[in-house]
Amino acid sequence: MINVAQLTRLPRKFGKYYDRQFLPLLEKTGLSMREIHVLLFLANHPGQDTARDVTELRGIAKSQVSQAVETLTGRGLLSRRADGEDRRIIHLEITEQGAPLAREAQAVQAACGGRLLAGLTEEEQTVFLELLERVLRRTEELSMEKECQP
Protein backbone atom coordinates (compact mmCIF):
# COMPACT_ATOMS: atom_id res chain seq x y z
CA MET A 1 0.00 0.00 0.00
CA ILE A 2 1.27 3.44 -0.88
CA ASN A 3 2.12 5.89 1.87
CA VAL A 4 0.51 9.12 0.66
CA ALA A 5 2.19 11.10 3.44
CA GLN A 6 5.56 10.29 1.88
CA LEU A 7 4.36 11.43 -1.53
CA THR A 8 3.18 14.76 -0.16
CA ARG A 9 6.38 15.25 1.83
CA LEU A 10 8.72 14.74 -1.13
CA PRO A 11 7.92 17.96 -3.05
CA ARG A 12 8.25 20.07 0.11
CA LYS A 13 11.54 18.49 1.14
CA PHE A 14 13.00 18.65 -2.35
CA GLY A 15 11.76 22.22 -2.84
CA LYS A 16 13.54 23.37 0.33
CA TYR A 17 16.74 21.56 -0.63
CA TYR A 18 16.58 22.86 -4.21
CA ASP A 19 15.97 26.49 -3.27
CA ARG A 20 18.76 26.38 -0.66
CA GLN A 21 21.27 25.38 -3.34
CA PHE A 22 20.59 28.67 -5.12
CA LEU A 23 21.29 30.90 -2.09
CA PRO A 24 24.85 31.83 -3.18
CA LEU A 25 23.58 32.77 -6.65
CA LEU A 26 20.70 34.77 -5.18
CA GLU A 27 23.07 36.65 -2.88
CA LYS A 28 25.52 37.31 -5.72
CA THR A 29 22.88 38.60 -8.14
CA GLY A 30 20.27 40.13 -5.86
CA LEU A 31 17.58 38.21 -7.75
CA SER A 32 14.71 36.33 -6.13
CA MET A 33 14.17 32.60 -6.45
CA ARG A 34 11.09 33.30 -8.57
CA GLU A 35 13.18 35.34 -11.00
CA ILE A 36 15.68 32.48 -11.20
CA HIS A 37 12.78 30.08 -11.83
CA VAL A 38 11.60 32.20 -14.78
CA LEU A 39 15.13 32.47 -16.19
CA LEU A 40 15.64 28.71 -15.83
CA PHE A 41 12.29 27.94 -17.42
CA LEU A 42 13.21 29.97 -20.49
CA ALA A 43 16.69 28.42 -20.65
CA ASN A 44 15.35 24.87 -20.30
CA HIS A 45 12.32 25.14 -22.60
CA PRO A 46 13.29 26.57 -25.99
CA GLY A 47 10.21 27.56 -27.96
CA GLN A 48 8.08 27.90 -24.83
CA ASP A 49 8.99 31.51 -24.34
CA THR A 50 5.97 33.54 -23.38
CA ALA A 51 4.83 34.63 -19.92
CA ARG A 52 1.77 32.45 -20.49
CA ASP A 53 4.02 29.41 -21.08
CA VAL A 54 5.84 30.09 -17.81
CA THR A 55 2.54 30.51 -15.96
CA GLU A 56 0.90 27.39 -17.35
CA LEU A 57 3.86 25.01 -17.46
CA ARG A 58 5.80 26.14 -14.40
CA GLY A 59 2.74 26.86 -12.28
CA ILE A 60 3.75 30.36 -11.20
CA ALA A 61 0.95 32.92 -10.83
CA LYS A 62 0.56 35.33 -13.73
CA SER A 63 1.20 38.38 -11.52
CA GLN A 64 4.40 36.83 -10.15
CA VAL A 65 5.66 35.96 -13.63
CA SER A 66 4.89 39.49 -14.78
CA GLN A 67 6.81 40.97 -11.85
CA ALA A 68 9.77 38.63 -12.42
CA VAL A 69 9.85 39.48 -16.13
CA GLU A 70 9.83 43.20 -15.30
CA THR A 71 12.80 42.77 -12.97
CA LEU A 72 14.73 40.57 -15.40
CA THR A 73 14.14 42.90 -18.36
CA GLY A 74 14.96 45.92 -16.22
CA ARG A 75 18.30 44.34 -15.36
CA GLY A 76 19.01 43.53 -19.00
CA LEU A 77 18.80 39.76 -18.49
CA LEU A 78 15.69 39.27 -20.66
CA SER A 79 14.29 41.05 -23.67
CA ARG A 80 10.80 41.09 -25.15
CA ARG A 81 10.01 40.51 -28.81
CA ALA A 82 6.58 40.76 -30.43
CA ASP A 83 5.44 37.71 -32.39
CA GLY A 84 5.75 38.10 -36.16
CA GLU A 85 2.21 36.87 -36.82
CA ASP A 86 0.32 38.03 -33.73
CA ARG A 87 1.70 41.21 -32.18
CA ARG A 88 -0.30 40.54 -29.00
CA ILE A 89 2.03 37.63 -28.23
CA ILE A 90 5.28 38.68 -26.60
CA HIS A 91 8.23 36.30 -26.66
CA LEU A 92 10.82 36.44 -23.91
CA GLU A 93 14.47 35.93 -24.76
CA ILE A 94 17.49 35.60 -22.52
CA THR A 95 19.92 38.34 -23.50
CA GLU A 96 23.66 38.05 -24.02
CA GLN A 97 24.04 39.56 -20.58
CA GLY A 98 21.60 37.04 -19.08
CA ALA A 99 23.04 33.94 -20.78
CA PRO A 100 25.98 33.43 -18.36
CA LEU A 101 23.62 33.69 -15.39
CA ALA A 102 21.20 31.22 -17.01
CA ARG A 103 24.07 28.77 -17.56
CA GLU A 104 25.22 29.19 -13.96
CA ALA A 105 21.68 28.54 -12.72
CA GLN A 106 21.42 25.47 -14.97
CA ALA A 107 24.67 24.16 -13.46
CA VAL A 108 23.22 24.53 -9.95
CA GLN A 109 20.07 22.79 -11.14
CA ALA A 110 22.02 19.90 -12.67
CA ALA A 111 24.12 19.52 -9.52
CA CYS A 112 20.92 19.29 -7.45
CA GLY A 113 19.61 16.47 -9.60
CA GLY A 114 22.96 14.72 -9.60
CA ARG A 115 23.25 14.84 -5.83
CA LEU A 116 19.68 13.69 -5.37
CA LEU A 117 20.14 10.61 -7.56
CA ALA A 118 23.76 9.89 -6.58
CA GLY A 119 22.76 6.91 -4.43
CA LEU A 120 21.13 5.13 -7.38
CA THR A 121 22.74 3.15 -10.16
CA GLU A 122 22.34 4.43 -13.71
CA GLU A 123 19.67 1.79 -14.35
CA GLU A 124 17.81 2.71 -11.15
CA GLN A 125 17.95 6.38 -12.13
CA THR A 126 16.46 5.58 -15.53
CA VAL A 127 13.65 3.52 -13.99
CA PHE A 128 13.01 6.13 -11.30
CA LEU A 129 12.79 8.98 -13.81
CA GLU A 130 10.49 6.97 -16.09
CA LEU A 131 8.19 6.15 -13.16
CA LEU A 132 8.31 9.73 -11.94
CA GLU A 133 7.26 10.96 -15.39
CA ARG A 134 4.31 8.55 -15.38
CA VAL A 135 3.25 9.69 -11.91
CA LEU A 136 3.55 13.34 -12.99
CA ARG A 137 1.39 12.70 -16.07
CA ARG A 138 -1.21 10.95 -13.92
CA THR A 139 -1.10 13.81 -11.42
CA GLU A 140 -1.82 16.24 -14.27
CA GLU A 141 -4.82 14.15 -15.32
CA LEU A 142 -6.15 13.93 -11.77
CA SER A 143 -5.64 17.63 -11.14
CA MET A 144 -8.35 18.30 -13.72
CA GLU A 145 -10.93 16.35 -11.70
CA LYS A 146 -13.21 18.30 -9.38
CA GLU A 147 -12.91 16.00 -6.38
CA CYS A 148 -10.91 13.04 -5.17
CA GLN A 149 -12.63 9.77 -6.01
CA PRO A 150 -11.77 6.38 -4.50
Regions found by a protein language model. Name each.
Residues 1, 123-150:
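C-terminal regulatory/oligomerization modules of transcriptional regulators
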Residues 1-9, 62-65, 147-149:
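Surface-exposed, interaction-prone regions with an acidic/low-complexity signature
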Residues 1-29, 75-77:
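N-terminal leader segment of winged-helix/HTH proteins
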Residues 3, 34, 50, 97, ...:
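N-terminal positioning helix adjacent to the helix-turn-helix/winged-helix DNA-binding module
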Residues 15, 40-46, 106, 133:
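Short, locally clustered residues in the helix-turn-helix/winged-helix DNA-binding domain
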Residues 19, 70-133:
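Charged, amphipathic alpha-helical coiled-coil/dimerization segments
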Residues 20-64, 147-148:
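N-terminal helix-turn-helix DNA-binding core of bacterial DNA-binding proteins
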